[in-house]
From Swiss-Prot:
Protein's name in the database: Deoxybrevianamide E synthase notF
Gene: notF
PANTHER family given in the database record: INDOLE PRENYLTRANSFERASE TDIB-RELATED (PTHR40627), PRENYLTRANSFERASE ASQH2-RELATED (PTHR40627:SF3)
GO terms, biological process: alkaloid metabolic process
Binding site for dimethylallyl diphosphate: R122, K212, Y214, K282, Y284, Y371, Y436, Y440
Application in biotechnology: Notoamides have been shown to exhibit antitumoral activities. Notoamides A-C show moderate cytotoxicity against HeLa and L1210 cells with IC(50) values in the range of 22-52 mg/ml, but the IC(50) value of notoamide D is greater than 100 mg/ml. Moreover, notoamide C induces G2/M-cell cycle arrest at a concentration of 6.3 mg/ml.
Regulation: Addition of 5 mM Mg(2+), Ca(2+) or Mn(2+) slightly enhances catalysis (about 100-120%). Significant reduction of enzyme activity (2%-35%) is observed with Cu(2+), Zn(2+), Fe(2+), or Sn(2+) (5 mM).
Family, as annotated: Belongs to the tryptophan dimethylallyltransferase family.
Pathway entry: Alkaloid biosynthesis
Organism listed in the record: Aspergillus sp. (strain MF297-2)
EC number: 2.5.1.109
Compositionally biased intervals (Basic and acidic residues): 1-19
Organism ancestry: Eukaryota, Fungi, Dikarya, Ascomycota, Pezizomycotina
Binding site for brevianamide F: E108
Function: Deoxybrevianamide E synthase; part of the gene cluster that mediates the biosynthesis of notoamide, a fungal indole alkaloid that belongs to a family of natural products containing a characteristic bicyclo[2.2.2]diazaoctane core. The first step of notoamide biosynthesis involves coupling of L-proline and L-tryptophan by the bimodular NRPS notE, to produce cyclo-L-tryptophan-L-proline called brevianamide F.
Length: 452
């Protein structure tokens, strides 16, 4: 016996049956974001921390959403941000100008984009205190040690400090060197780039927080009266004397940097907080000649890597995004200052080009990465250029959403009118991973360049 056919088109609800809610009817309030929920039960002990939270907390929450993290991870990372980074941002409004961002803000958010991959959120961070820049701590030494000690007490994934500690010992000013620079008339205002170290935090989808360290050798070289390149080469030699895992690739970098006068006050290094056998070493540089010819030269180490298929394939893709961004070519007037309000000098707006050479243990040659300067470029144009490039790579999950994602990150701004929400576009390429890109952002809610 078969069941009678149910015809849905003949079903009629009784006249007095309750109706489905219409779109116009009021909805239940949405759940609070992790930032809102945690802040409801947290008392910030100082007005400065509360103000920094207002400037960065909700924005960080939106970046977590843009990174497509699960709700448990959002709460976990927000808790870390609230309890360990907010207290280390120092006084508000800021007094210390950090080297890590174009505005001098001591915090910088970035999102990493790869094919078919979760967007990875990162934070660049220089801890600051009320003493930073004062006569007691003119070059911000104390907060670096304080945050390092604080992180060491947490249960962070694969957290290992000896490699970073070695770099710090080689490049951080001693107290006698601080006094020496002050006597020479080279106090904290003698050069705008006065940071000595900083941290980076990668927020992994599985909930792990990976830590990186950055060191800036220029002040040490100045105090010791030795060239920056000499100081760096000696530090790498001593740290690699037992394992010999960076020697060959670093030799290629050092030769090129010496012949091209690539070492300067903007050169710095970074490492991971992992065991030395798994360590990567990165050498960063900056150049005011923002031209395709210079980019191609630096990408190939002055022709030293011209025979490597991986390098040439990556350069071809780099030319694509360079052309789409339409960054004005030429020599930049940048002299190391900051662009932090609408009255900034014209020569502080345009940024230099930044690059790094990443050395993996035992590698034959370094992996180049370039940071294309888009600070000062129209934000919507940059977003559309990225979307077009990602579409050409077959990344629809990023290409289709990015302009809208950027607008959602900054709901109070019109991205067709702003020019400083995106600061850098980083690009690297390997045969195994393909194109690997990140976007670095203005990282506080206030848009510092608002017109009256």
């Amino acid at each position: 016996m078969t069941a009678p056919e149910l015809r849905v088109d003949t079903f009629r609800a009784p006249e007095d049956a309750p109706k489905e809610p219409s779109a116009q009817q009021p909805r239940l309030p949405s759940s609070p974001s992790p930032a809102q929920a945690l802040a409801s039960y947290h008392h910030f002990p100082t007005n400065d921390q509360e103000r920094w939270w207002e400037e960065t907390g909700s924005l960080f929450s939106r970046f977590l959403e843009a990174g497509q993290y699960g709700l448990p991870q959002q709460y976990q990372f927000m808790f870390f941000f609230m309890h360990h980074l907010i207290p280390a941002l120092g006084p508000y409004p800021q007094k210390w100008r950090s080297t890590i961002s174009r505005s001098g803000l001591p915090i910088e958010f970035s999102l990493n984009f790869q094919k078919g991959s979760h967007r990875l959120l990162r934070i660049g961070f220089e801890p600051v205190s009320f003493l930073s820049g004062s006569s007691q701590d003119p070059f911000n030494r104390i907060p670096i040690t304080d945050l390092l000690n604080r992180l060491s007490k947490l249960q962070l994934s694969n957290f290992d400090t000896p490699f970073f500690q070695h770099l710090l010992s080689k490049f951080q000013l001693s107290l006698s060197e601080v006094r020496q620079l002050q006597k020479q008339g080279s106090g904290p205002d003698a050069h705008p780039l006065k940071s000595q170290a900083a941290f980076g935090f990668d927020f992994n989808p599985d909930g792990a927080i990976l830590v990186k360290g950055y060191v800036f050798p220029y002040l040490k070289a100045k105090a010791a009266d030795v060239p920056v390149g000499t100081l760096i080469a000696e530090a790498v030699r001593t740290i690699d004397v037992e394992r010999n895992q960076f020697t060959h690739a670093f030799g290629l970098i050092n030769d090129y940097m010496q012949e091209s006068t690539g070492y300067n006050e903007y050169t710095f290094l970074s490492c991971d907080f992992v065991e030395t056998s798994e360590q990567r070493l990165k050498i960063y540089g900056a150049h005011t000649e923002v031209t395709w010819a210079k980019i191609a030269e630096m990408w190939t180490l002055g022709g030293r890597l011209i025979e490597e298929p991986e390098i040439i394939a990556g350069l071809a893709r780099l030319k694509q995004i360079w052309s789409l961004l339409q960054i004005g070519e030429g020599s930049r007037a940048f002299k190391g200052g900051f662009d932090y309000d609408k009255s900034s000098a014209t020569d502080q707006i345009a940024s230099p080009i930044i690059w790094n050479y990443e050395i993996h243990p035992g590698s034959r040659f370094p992996v180049p990465k370039f940071y294309l300067p888009v600070h000062g470029e129209n934000d919507l144009h940059v977003a559309r250029a990225l979307a077009q490039f990602w579409d050409s790579l077959g990344w629809p999950e990023h290409a289709c959403a990015y302009p809208d994602t950027l607008q959602q990150l900054y709901p109070d701004q019109d991205i067709s009118q702003t020019t400083r929400l995106q600061s850098w576009i980083s690009y690297s390429y390997t045969a195994k991973r393909g194109v690997y890109m990140s976007v670095y952002y203005h990282s506080q809610s206030t848009y510092l360049w608002e017109e009256d």
